[in-house]
A protein has these predicted regions:
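Carbohydrate-associated surface elements
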Residues: 146, 168
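A conserved catalytic-core segment of Leloir-type glycosyltransferases
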Residues: 2-57
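Conserved donor-binding/catalytic core segment of Leloir-type glycosyltransferases
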Residues: 180-198, 204-207, 220
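A short beta-strand/loop micro-motif in the catalytic core of glycosyltransferases
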Residues: 74, 119, 136-145, 190
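Active-site proximal beta-strand in glycosyltransferases
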Residues: 72-74, 86-116, 141
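Nucleotide-activated donor-binding/catalytic signature segment of Leloir-type glycosyltransferases, i.e.
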Residues: 218-223, 229-248
Length: 248
């Protein structure tokens, strides 16, 4: 994060397996003597995503030593079990952008491969913890009305516990610039992740149809395209390689 020099940043240690070339072999055997490290290593190498769980265990150990130094604890959607401990000790706010269970539903709908569906469910196994914790939190911040409805329905969270704080844009940084020449028939969209939930399929299919009416139309996507992923395959299928650009 980009912090003021006076703000102290405490980095929570982990095995960092997702950053390594081999999640299985690139580990010092002595690190696995720690039970939590061993759990993380086994979980990742069996298709799980243990980071929300392991983060909670590690953050509790660190913060508990100096709990009096903290005025407020703000969780950004880890929804770890340890939040229920902190909630009894300090003012706690949790931001939930959207329930990840919706991602899982859309991903399951995007394939007929039974084995792949099992892997998807395995990766999202942390949702059991997140659903348990979310409904027991006293105050949750959400970024939109649709997120509020989704969290209420997916996680069974009381609407009165949620507060809408809409996403904003710094107009000192982002504003129309008359010096920049407008490109006719260019569309711009934002996709924070290359996953079915973001709905890029519908936009790309619509673009394919609009070419017949607007031959000069193009699409710029602010986001990263997953190499060899579903979106890349769809762009090739619709013959849109020269019409679509990604910027990240």
């Amino acid at each position: 994060p980009d912090l003021d020099p006076e703000i102290k940043l405490v980095k929570i240690p982990s095995l960092g397996l997702y950053e390594k070339k081999s999640k299985f072999f690139d580990v010092n055997p002595t690190e696995l003597l720690n039970p939590l490290n061993l759990f993380e290593w086994l979980s990742v190498n069996s298709g799980g995503f243990p980071e929300p769980y392991t983060f909670g265990k590690r953050i509790k150990k660190i913060i508990k030593k100096n709990l009096d130094e903290y005025d407020v604890i703000h969780d950004n959607q880890s929804l770890a079990y340890e939040l229920l401990f902190f909630q009894k000790k300090k003012p706690l706010i949790t931001t939930i952008h959207h329930p990840i269970s919706k991602d899982l539903k859309y991903q399951l709908q995007s394939t007929d491969d039974f084995f792949l569906k099992l892997l998807m469910r395995r990766w999202h196994s942390f949702l059991v913890m997140q659903k348990f914790v979310a409904k027991r939190l006293k105050k949750i911040v959400v970024p939109s009305n649709s997120s509020l409805e989704d969290i209420k329905n997916e996680f069974q969270v009381d609407e009165n516990k949620m507060e809408r704080v809409m996403n904003g844009i710094d107009l000192k940084l982002f504003y129309p610039d008359s010096k920049i020449k407008k490109i006719p028939f260019r569309l711009v969209t934002v996709a924070s992740a290359d996953v079915p939930l973001k709905g890029l399929d519908y936009l790309l299919e619509a673009l394919s149809d609009l070419i017949k009416v607007y031959p000069d139309i193009s699409l710029s996507i602010i986001g990263e395209q997953r190499k060899g992923g579903h979106t890349e395959r769809l762009i090739k299928k619709l013959n849109l390689q020269k019409r679509v650009n990604f910027f990240s």
